Every structure is written in C-alpha cells, then in structure tokens.
A protein has these predicted regions:
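Conserved N-terminal alpha-helix of the aminotransferase class I/II PLP-enzyme fold
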Residues: 65-113
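Short coil/turn connectors at secondary-structure junctions
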Residues: 44, 104-106, 129-132
C-alpha cells in the first residue's frame, strides 16, 4: 500500500499558500473571438477571454482552419511521435521553410511552445559558447529562469 500522507500534505500546503492550480474548463467559440464558454464547478457562463495565446487570431482565420482540415483529411490527427523517432511532418517542414524565407534566414525550427524554445535556446548557447554567462532576474519568464539555474 502506498502512503499518500506526504502527497496530501504537499497539496494542503499549496492550497494554504494559494498556489494550488485549478485549470479553467473553457470552450472557445470560433468566429466570436475573444468570447468563450466557461464550464465552472457550479455554472456554465459566457466569458471574455483575453488570456489566449492566439494573439493574431490565426486560430480563427478561415484560411488556416481550411488548411488544417486538409491536413487532417490527408494525415489524420496526432504527431505520430517525436521528430527524432517518427520523422517530421511534411507540413512542419514546409512551415519551417516558409518561416525561414519570411525572416531571411537559411532555416527555421518549430518548437512546441515558446517555453520550450527559450529553454533549448539557452541549452544550445551554453554548449556552443564555452563559459557563457547568463544574466537574469526574477522579472524574466520562468522558462529562462529555470533553465539558467
């Protein structure tokens, strides 16, 4: 039998400190940005959600949505694995070429999130530049702070 007491204590401490996370259950309404539907514990409410990472509204753009449907019809859903193991989706390769062209570089690389891009940029820099020093403070994004530590 597993002793759950240590885990329960950590959870209780997080709740007391106000650091226990409860994730909002929402549905974004396509074509009605920034409105969403929030599924709360006691009610369902219409809300305005300005916290989305869809800064440019590309997730609402008909051309983007149509392209996604085409890709889904051709390849199905899901990545099929990491690029290193299962290969890289042709759509990702095409997007990387387009981004490189847009920014006038020889190549581009997609990451799953800005957090991961920040982390691995620091890893690459620290491997390429011997004795590099990173200066940071608590105002930096946690992706930078955690990797610098």
């Amino acid at each position: 039998m597993i002793n759950k007491d240590p885990f329960n204590k950590v959870l209780q401490d997080l709740k007391k400190q106000g650091r226990y996370r409860v994730f909002n259950d929402i549905v974004r309404e396509r074509g009605d940005f920034p409105k969403s539907i929030w599924y709360g514990p006691y009610a369902i409410k219409n809300i305005v959600n300005w916290c989305s990472n869809d800064y440019l509204g590309m997730g609402q753009n008909k051309v983007v949505i149509d392209a996604m449907h085409t890709a889904l019809d051709q390849t199905g859903s899901g990545s099929g694995g990491t690029r290193n193991i299962g290969g890289t989706s042709h759509y990702h390769v095409a997007l990387e070429h387009e981004l490189a062209k847009l920014h006038g570089t020889s190549s581009a690389l997609l990451f799953t999130s800005a957090y991961v891009a920040n982390e691995w940029t620091l890893v690459a820099l620290s491997k390429i530049i011997p004795n590099i020093k990173f200066l940071s403070d608590n105002s930096n994004h946690s992706s930078l702070i955690e990797r610098i530590r």
